[in-house]
């Protein structure tokens, strides 16, 4: 994930320099309006057209999906469990098969990559050779008609990727590749999360003792909604020299279709779990089989132990040296590096519940339970996930049934 965050801040500064160059060029010449108009839609579209404002429609429960996954390590993270090695993608399939539902998948993932690198073989904001992704993308374009579902996610932080990596444009390119081949397909944006303990230096989080994970999650939800809305429009900001010089040229991304892009609210489910852990309902069970009480940190691969329970401190609190305190903390597994962004086996289980509920439009209550979770905790998590998914207006799922 970190490579995708490097140089994005510097990229923004370079854009300002390009705009100054643009101002100088405008003093020398004036581009005819026809030239700019011709540059505004450079991806030819011979595909079906369905124009209009995207409307989030309710989804009837599905009996099977053929899904193509596009993303980075928060899609492909692996963990060991009693079921063997699991990933998000494999666990969604396990859940589906347990219900007698169809599940077929393909994937196009690369650790730490924004959608730009997955489409064009290199990112815009930093140097990385991802050329091996181009043949995979071309293969997807050639076989897209085999899929009825597309799940994509973006590198973090999303607000920086929107500007420096032209996220909406590349989301649109993948969207059009699928929609042109299968107009009845559905496209989903997988909303992820920020570092639980604020360990990402490229997101410019406040110092650790002031870092408010929940507030950051709530604030960043709008970035995901903005990306989904932009990708569903037939006019998106196109990368290239015009964009670098400050001219917002537009492209349809390969089609004029404007069906909605739905959101898989994994990040929102984590926020809901955060809240319920602090204020449990009478039916909640957070007692883990090993005798401990579930914490949000249990969802992550290797967070710090003994994170100060009174953080974040209020603005009025006496200032301290957070770096010195964090330096004394140890990750749960001292033999490995601190990791507060990737998922543990329990985290993969939780996020897979969110994906199953959203993609199939079905309650996850009653899905298989690993012994590490236990029946009581599993039912609490399954009920919470269904409440989040079925009440999120961007998920495309609504239901009257409750736990």
What kind of region is each of these model predictions?
Residues 365, 369-403:
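A cross-kingdom marker for long, charged
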Residues 123-141:
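Glycine-rich, highly charged phosphate/nucleotide-binding loops
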Residues 45-109:
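Serine-esterase "nucleophile elbow" of acetyl-processing enzymes
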Residues 35-47:
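Signal peptide processing junction and immediate N-terminal pro/mature segment
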Residues 1-17:
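N-terminal secretory signal peptides that target proteins for export/translocation
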Residues 102-120, 268-271:
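Short connector loops at secondary-structure junctions
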Residues 24-33:
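Bacterial N-terminal signal peptides
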Residues 136-341, 345:
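Alpha-helical cap/lid subdomain in secreted, periplasmic
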